[in-house]
Design a protein with these regions (language model features):
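Basic (Lys/Arg-enriched) interaction patch that binds polyanionic ligands
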Residues: 199-250
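Ferredoxin-like alpha/beta domains used as RNA- or RNAP-binding modules
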Residues: 1-203, 209, 232, 246, ...
């Protein structure tokens, strides 16, 4: 990817601060995490949450801090680079194991047939009436075409093995794996992109990522089709920060990996990739 001319002086880095709970569901989650922590540390027993998104993990950390918990917890998603993860609260003398299993799904497609995509697997799993928090990541390794690995809470994993027979129009076989049996997945190769924008406003950055006009980007934002870090973003003028993850319904997800500084024409340089 093309390197752009940059200013000599690096720009001071701004960081997005923690955003407190904004909905009843988020406030309930924080109270639930505090209750788990109280039970775990008052009784010296391990306690585990359901799968949490990145945003929910931030809320969980805040809830633990509010409960005075500084250690004795971790987040586990079943594999190294997991996005969706379970909060494991494990006091020093407790015994426990994260209730995570993995189901390997293998397609029984004819040669040359189109293989299911991530959305096909997720749609089939939702068709089993599973709650999203019972499911972790769905990994489609590039070196294993036609194979997907679904991380799930143990009861959900058992249900998947009993009830899931196809994804989209493709028949599947299922196999329950322990986490020790899950192979190491190759690091996904991300195609990095670089662009310059007039400002670090959401509409300007989104327009660069989507190769559209700022007006079109603003329409997507105002239509409620854009999220930043799993939170709705409805203001085109909102400031963006390094590390932000943008979800645009119908367009994909993007990670703003770096804000290296200014170009010679005094425009902000952004670096990003699409998932």
């Amino acid at each position: 990817w093309r390197t752009m001319a940059r200013s000599i002086d690096p720009q001071p880095k701004a960081a997005r601060g923690f955003i407190p709970a904004r909905t009843d569901e988020e406030r309930y989650l924080m109270r639930h995490i505090e209750d788990l922590a109280h039970t775990a540390f008052s009784r010296d027993i391990a306690r585990y949450s359901a799968f949490l998104s990145d945003r929910e993990q931030d809320l969980a950390r805040a809830a633990l801090g509010r409960a005075g918990v500084q250690e004795g917890f971790r987040f586990e998603g079943g594999w190294l680079n997991a996005e969706r993860r379970v909060l494991c609260i494990e006091p020093e003398y407790s015994c426990g194991e994260a209730p995570i299993c993995c189901v390997r799904l293998q397609c029984r497609a004819q040669a040359g047939a189109a293989l299911p995509a991530h959305k096909d697997y997720l749609g089939s799993l939702m068709g089993l009436e599973l709650r999203r928090e019972a499911l972790g990541d769905i990994v489609l390794p590039e070196d294993q075409p036609g194979t997907a690995y679904v991380f799930a809470l143990e009861p959900a994993a058992q249900l998947i093995c009993r009830e899931l027979f196809q994804a989209g129009h493709t028949e599947l076989t299922t196999e329950l794996l322990t986490l020790d049996e899950v192979p190491q997945f190759p690091q996904a190769e991300r195609e990095m992109h670089s662009a310059t924008v007039s400002s670090l406003r959401l509409d300007a950055v989104l327009a660069a990522m989507l190769h559209c006009s700022r007006g079109q980007a603003s329409e997507l934002i105002e239509a409620g089709r854009v999220e930043i870090n799993h939170l709705p973003a409805d203001k085109p003028h909102a400031q963006v920060y390094e590390g932000d993850v943008f979800t645009v319904r119908g367009k994909g997800r993007f990670n703003l990996t770096a804000l290296p500084g200014k170009s010679r024409k005094d425009r902000s340089i952004i670096e990003f990739f699409q998932y």
